[in-house]
Amino acid sequence: MTENKVESNSYLTFKVGEEEFGAHVSQVLNILEMTKITEVPKTPDYMKGVINLRGTVLPIIDTRLKFGLPETEYTSNTCIVVMDLDFNGDTVHIGAIVDEVLSVVEIEKGQIEPPPSIGNRYKSDFIHGMAKVEENFVMLLDMQQILSNTELSEISGKAENQPV
């Protein structure tokens, strides 16, 4: 007797601007309320600064700026999603400011479509795919690809040298 096993994955869904995005829960470490961010000089615009997370310096990026949207206007829903990324075999934690965290959803592999090759304003190399969740399309992000190794190196290096 064969078993039909459907492979599904859990994604944390959140809003950036008017769009819904999802990040695989294996890459999400924590969700934090907005807090005071210490600015770091001579960093890219999308790097808002650093915060102290349990005695560790955590670099914070503004996903709106990284995606080419206007800077985030903070509301009561704005929060920081702490991501767990691999950088040359080392684990690097990055905080990503999002407009609102929505929910955790299960998405079967068969529901994931490739990202469109035209008409997408976001770089397709960090969009893993698209899935319809209820009535909305969710862009599934490969958080590992949002920042290049060079950007990760620059951000984590400057963050480590910053007092918080």
Could you say what each language-model-derived stretch is?
Residues 1-164:
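An acidic, low-aromatic, low-complexity terminal/linker signal
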